[in-house]
Amino acid sequence: MQVASILQVRPPFFPQIHFLLFFFCFFVSKSRVASQRGTHFLVRICFEPPLQGCRMGKLCRPHLNHLLYLCYTAYFSNISWLSVSKSTSRNRVHKYIPYKSTELRSVAN
């Protein structure tokens, strides 16, 4: 019953969800690069129009999956960038090349 009530959220509640996700991922990130990446994904959540086929007055499954995908992408990119930035030395400048969400390679300039 709770799942059915969650899936029938009214449109005025959408901005509250968007801004909660925005502030969550923005404050979780510790480095400047990570916060910019998280902000980029979450600005798409806040300002993108609803997906085609989404009925007014209900949070449909494609819209919910879209929000979760963008939130998880921003969250895990913040974690991976943060873990690499902690492990690098301060004396050398590194260039980060992400291959996957869990695999990053640092290349010295």
From Swiss-Prot:
It comes from the Eukaryota. Partially overlaps YDL186W. This is Putative uncharacterized protein YDL187C.
